C-alpha cells in the first residue's frame, strides 16, 4: 500500500495509468509532508530559552497534534474506498444499502482529510508566535502544504457528490484556510 512506498515509487505509481494511488493519496501524502514540516519547526523550538519562555510547551503541544501517520493512512483508506467503489459499479447484484455504505465511505475519507488539514493549519497558526524565529518559514511551509492538501482532498470529495451541507462546511474551512494563507503571504 501507499504508506509502505518510498517517495520515488509512490510518485511513479501516482503517474502510472492505474486507479490507485490517485488524487486522494496525493492529497494525503501532501498533508503528511506539511505536517512533518511544521513538526520540524516545532522540534527546533526546544532550546533552553524556549523552555524558559514557554515556547517549548507550545512546540510540544503542536507536535502532539500533528499526526503524520493518520494523514498517511488516509492514502491507503482512499485506495481501499476507491477499490470498493469500482466493485460497486460492476456488481449488479449489490444491494442498494451496500452501495450507499460504500459511497459514504468514499466520501468520508477526503472529508476527514480536509477536516484534519484544517485542524492542523489552525494549530500551526496558533504556534507561529512561539516558533523559533529562525525557522518560522518551515512552519509556514507546513501551513501551505496542508492548505494544498485540503484543497486537493476537497476536489476528491466533490467527485463523491457530497450533500450541500457537507459541501458548504468544507468550503467554509477552505475559506478560513485561504484567509490564513493570504495573511502569511501578505496578500490580505
What is the role of each PLM region?
Residues 120, 134-188:
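Preference for long, well-ordered alpha-helical segments
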